Amino acid sequence: MANIKSAKKRAIQAEKNRRHNASRRSMMRTYLKRVNAAIETKDKEAANTAMKDVAPMLDRYATKGLISKNKAARHKSRLNAKIKAL
């Protein structure tokens, strides 16, 4: 454990941010699973609705640095391709 006050504070902040980011990553994965589940059941309407929720979320997390912008683009591209194939 750190001895310097500022290092202790940064350790606490890092842990707080880690928990927050883990929560956001979990939520993102859940929403991605919803889109994939709709695609699996071949429900285009539900897939489009779920995609409308996921796309801005991916962009937001890419902007905030939770995921890279390429990863966000890759997810959106692949999901849209799967939806169009229905």
UniProtKB/Swiss-Prot annotation:
Region listing for Disordered, in residue ranges: 1-26
Record-level Gene Ontology MF annotations: small ribosomal subunit rRNA binding; structural constituent of ribosome
Any one cellular-component term (Gene Ontology): small ribosomal subunit
Pfam family, one: Ribosomal_S20p
GO BP, one annotated term: translation
UniProt keyword Ribosomal protein present: yes
SUPFAM superfamilies documented for this protein: Ribosomal protein S20
Assigned keywords, A-Z: Ribonucleoprotein, Ribosomal protein, RNA-binding, rRNA-binding
Disulfide bonds: none
Function: Binds directly to 16S ribosomal RNA.
NCBIfam families per UniProt: S20 (TIGR00029)
Family of the protein in this entry: Belongs to the bacterial ribosomal protein bS20 family.
Protein name: Small ribosomal subunit protein bS20
Source species taxonomy: Bacteria, Pseudomonadati, Pseudomonadota, Gammaproteobacteria, Alteromonadales
